[in-house]
């Protein structure tokens, strides 16, 4: 395992984070460029996304916490100050969805998912440095979500609202999503930052929110027949249940496990551990003989998206290492190592740094999608490296 940890440290330092420092830092307008395309061309005037910047903040904060390299603290602080100065809505609370390349508000809607990632980033910076300002911002954003996005009547969190926290017609995270007022993805990326915030701010109100989120996963989001997580719902939690997303399933399996472990309630942990093993088994339907995991299965028409997306492989590796660590099942270690071998061979860009977005069904590299951008950040892959460095397995 020491060899695997050494490899992860090398990839993190010399393939991922150095790319973001050397290639993506925006020296002219501050923060980081909004886009580097699939051919490694920088687009200096691209809009800058909240999710990307919050994830950069998280990645460098976590890397500094674990590896203590001053250049990671410098990059984390750069991201912290940029998000604080340009994305935080000083008037209405929350954060903007995007700003232009000069840092002026562009899309001012309040996407709960993005606010969740800001909490993830600021709480990790506070965890890594003890910085009170970052912690205060994370707590304030938590209160914004609870005040405006939590639906006490139906339970759960509203997908998106206007800048002033009013209803909004188009709630979608991206063009690929259904326009549902409740999504699994947003709930996953609220429980994840709430768990991280709980590490540095253990309060009864936050614990109550986390326990409720675990109940939402087990009672509403989990498909009791297939053990996949269903993705899109309306206010009353009615959904089509027609998509199986293998990457989200395996990501949820280890994130929910992490939440139960951090909470420290043995009864909750026992319940969650029973469920997450079933979710992981369902996710394994996406595994392919080459060691990779495909993206999605649309049950209407029995169609598969066979792209091997970078983030799905990362979550597949962490999820199976988590299962091996806690349940000592050798086949899970084998799944993780085979997937890593696939990633090292196909997705890592050995020449230019960072990872390609995906390998297409025909085995070619997807260069249409970004190397760095609105949805491509040093989050999934740096987290995979850090999880494998930090864990005892």
Residue ranges and their predicted role:
Residues 1-393:
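Glycan-recognition and catalytic cores of secretory/periplasmic carbohydrate-active enzymes
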């Amino acid at each position: 395992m020491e060899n695997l940890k050494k490899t992860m440290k090398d990839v993190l330092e010399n393939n991922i984070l150095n790319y973001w420092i050397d290639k993506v830092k925006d020296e002219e307008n501050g923060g980081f460029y909004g886009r580097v395309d699939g051919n490694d061309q920088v687009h200096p005037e691209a809009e800058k996304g909240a999710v990307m910047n919050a994830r950069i903040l998280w990645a460098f904060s976590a890397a500094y916490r674990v590896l203590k390299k001053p250049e990671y603290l410098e990059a984390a602080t750069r991201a912290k100050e940029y998000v604080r100065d340009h994305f935080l809505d000083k008037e209405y609370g929350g954060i903007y969805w995007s700003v232009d390349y000069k840092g002026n508000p562009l899309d001012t809607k309040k996407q709960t998912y993005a606010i969740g990632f800001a909490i993830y980033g600021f709480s990790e910076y506070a965890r890594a440095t003890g910085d009170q300002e970052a912690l205060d911002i994370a707590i304030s954003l938590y209160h914004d979500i609870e005040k405006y996005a939590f639906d006490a009547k139906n339970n759960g969190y509203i997908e998106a609202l206007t800048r002033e926290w009013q209803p909004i017609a188009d709630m979608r995270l991206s063009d690929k999503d259904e326009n549902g007022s409740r999504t699994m993805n947003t709930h996953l990326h609220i429980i994840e930052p709430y768990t991280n915030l709980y590490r540095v701010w253990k309060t009864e109100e936050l614990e109550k929110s986390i326990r409720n989120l675990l109940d939402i996963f087990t009672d509403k989001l989990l498909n009791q027949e297939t053990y996949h997580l269903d993705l899109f719902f309306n206010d009353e939690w009615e959904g089509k249940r027609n998509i199986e997303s293998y990457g989200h399933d395996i990501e949820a399996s280890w994130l929910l496990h992490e939440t139960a472990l951090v909470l420290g309630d043995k009864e909750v942990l026992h319940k969650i551990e029973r469920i997450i093993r079933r979710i992981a088994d369902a996710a394994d339907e996406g595994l392919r003989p080459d060691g990779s995991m495909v993206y999605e299965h649309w049950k209407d028409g029995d169609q598969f998206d066979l792209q091997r997306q970078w983030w799905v492989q990362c979550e597949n590796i962490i999820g199976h290492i988590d299962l091996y660590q806690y349940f000592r099942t050798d086949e899970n270690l084998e799944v993780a190592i085979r997937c890593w071998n696939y990633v090292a061979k196909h997705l890592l860009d050995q020449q230019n740094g960072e990872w390609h977005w995906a390998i297409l069904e025909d085995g070619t590299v997807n260069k249409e999608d970004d190397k760095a951008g609105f949805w491509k950040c040093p989050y999934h892959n740096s987290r995979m490296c850090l999880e494998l460095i930090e864990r005892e397995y």
